[in-house]
Amino acid sequence: MATGADVRDILELGGPEGDAASGTISKKDIINPDKKKSKKSSETLTFKRPEGMHREVYALLYSDKKDAPPLLPSDTGQGYRTVKAKLGSKKVRPWKWMPFTNPARKDGAMFFHWRRAAEEGKDYPFARFNKTVQVPVYSEQEYQLYLHDDAWTKAETDHLFDLSRRFDLRFVVIHDRYDHQQFKKRSVEDLKERYYHICAKLANVRAVPGTDLKIPVFDAGHERRRKEQLERLYNRTPEQVAEEEYLLQELRKIEARKKEREKRSQDLQKLITAADTTAEQRRTERKAPKKKLPQKKEAEKPAVPETAGIKFPDFKSAGVTLRSQRMKLPSSVGQKKIKALEQMLLELGVELSPTPTEELVHMFNELRSDLVLLYELKQACANCEYELQMLRHRHEALARAGVLGAPAAAAVGPTPASAEPTVSESGLGLDPTKDTIIDVVGAPLTPNSRKRRESASSSSSVKKAKKP
């Protein structure tokens, strides 16, 4: 059964503690349920955060007592939170002043330090860092049989191995401490070569048959060449550094031109292949009987690559579509190609939007695809002509300057105005010597075809004027 307190909670009413304890509801509570009685609560003063101060900074300044932050900096603890030390109630672990010895020292020196009483009798904790290099030891008989060298005496070899044990194979320190007065002056590479040669000999002699050997190898010649190259690199003059940077920049330019030439040759080859494929398919369609053409019209459509011609979308989805939508050019064709295509159609006397019958749509799309392919081939041919003309001018300039031994006409002769590069089924009919020049010399970026034709015509006219 619900009590008065439950009813008060449901109606969101508050009352005195006596009423809440007894569970009685007054008349005012039932008549005016919206009026809530304010609870007596301790009023706390709040301070507004100053403008421009971050919330995190203000939280650091705000103390637990809700006091206002100080206006002036002071040394008192008011306004800042102090970290209290958390002291446990456990018993403190005892520490003891005890002696210890370092195993790395051979003199047996005794030292003292504080350690926990529970660790009494244990080894020195830093003894695990006492790592030494195992330098091999050889006998007199082994030296005479396997390690004898005319350039090294036994006393000098013993001195080298003694320094190797003392300085843990730090050959720079060994070279500094080497007795150059008593023995011959040696370089760091000579010391390394002698040491590792003896280690390899001893490893081969003492090896057990059937075990894998880890023989240290040191190439002294390679190390000498490496240091010599580093010394030359360090001793370069500012002029040499600038020249090297210039050569690196030229190398990057040559590589970029080479990549661009390869890309253009690949695009040109794709265009030629597409032209050959389209011509072959046209011949096949002409040879086929007329009765079978309507049956194979859907299955044997000429497949023009995306890189050449126009790739029209296929409307194979369910639903009703207009046939004129098949003549719509895709978005991949640029505005420049569209304008050139419209100009060629007007020159041929073909309507830009003919009646969209089945046969007309198919033939109109094929015609526009062939026209775009022809436009791309003309552009590629113009690029090649422009590059060839630029290379011919550069070759003649070098020949006049005396850089090339052969005359300009011997390598690349002047071509007549009527000679034009023809496109055959195998490729472009270019001279092999011209291909060699194009592969070796990097051509600059080509401008528009109109500018190319103007520059070519102007250069030819200048040549004719110079001739006597």
UniProtKB/Swiss-Prot annotation:
Q: Which GO terms describe its biological process?
A: chromatin remodeling; DNA repair; negative regulation of transcription by RNA polymerase II; positive regulation of DNA-templated transcription; positive regulation of double-strand break repair via homologous recombination; positive regulation of protein import into nucleus; regulation of apoptotic process; regulation of cell cycle
Q: Can you state the subunit structure given in the record?
A: Component of the NuA4 histone acetyltransferase complex which contains the catalytic subunit KAT5/TIP60 and the subunits EP400, TRRAP/PAF400, BRD8/SMAP, EPC1, DMAP1/DNMAP1, RUVBL1/TIP49, RUVBL2, ING3, actin, ACTL6A/BAF53A, MORF4L1/MRG15, MORF4L2/MRGX, MRGBP, YEATS4/GAS41, VPS72/YL1 and MEAF6. Component of a NuA4-related complex which contains EP400, TRRAP/PAF400, SRCAP, BRD8/SMAP, EPC1, DMAP1/DNMAP1, RUVBL1/TIP49, RUVBL2, actin, ACTL6A/BAF53A, VPS72 and YEATS4/GAS41. DMAP1 also forms a complex with DNMT1 and HDAC2.
Where Phosphoserine occurs, the residues are: S449
Q: Which InterPro entries match?
A: DAMP1_SANT-like, DMAP1, Swc4/Dmap1
Residue ranges annotated for the SANT domain, each copy included: 149-199
Q: Which PANTHER family match?
A: DNA METHYLTRANSFERASE 1-ASSOCIATED PROTEIN 1, DNA METHYLTRANSFERASE 1-ASSOCIATED PROTEIN 1 FAMILY MEMBER
Identify the domain of life: Eukaryota
Coiled-coil blocks: 225-275
Assigned GO CC terms: cytoplasm; cytosol; NuA4 histone acetyltransferase complex; nucleoplasm; nucleosome; nucleus; replication fork
Modification sites for Phosphothreonine? T446
* Pfam families per UniProt: DMAP1, SANT_DAMP1_like
- Cite the location of the cross-link Glycyl lysine isopeptide (Lys-Gly) (interchain with G-Cter in SUMO2) from the record: K27, K214
Keywords linked to the UniProt accession: Chromatin regulator, Coiled coil, Cytoplasm, Growth regulation, Isopeptide bond, Nucleus, Phosphoprotein, Repressor, Transcription, Transcription regulation, Ubl conjugation
Composition bias, Basic and acidic residues:
1-11, 26-48, 258-267
Q: Does the keyword Transcription regulation apply?
A: yes
Function comment? Involved in transcription repression and activation. Its interaction with HDAC2 may provide a mechanism for histone deacetylation in heterochromatin following replication of DNA at late firing origins. Can also repress transcription independently of histone deacetylase activity. May specifically potentiate DAXX-mediated repression of glucocorticoid receptor-dependent transcription. Component of the NuA4 histone acetyltransferase (HAT) complex which is involved in transcriptional activation of select genes principally by acetylation of nucleosomal histones H4 and H2A.
Question: Which organism encodes this protein?
Answer: Mus musculus
Region Disordered: what ranges? Answer: 1-48, 258-305, 411-468
Q: What is this protein called?
A: DNA methyltransferase 1-associated protein 1
Q: Where in the cell is it found?
A: Nucleus; Cytoplasm
**One MF annotation (Gene Ontology) recorded for this entry:** transcription corepressor activity
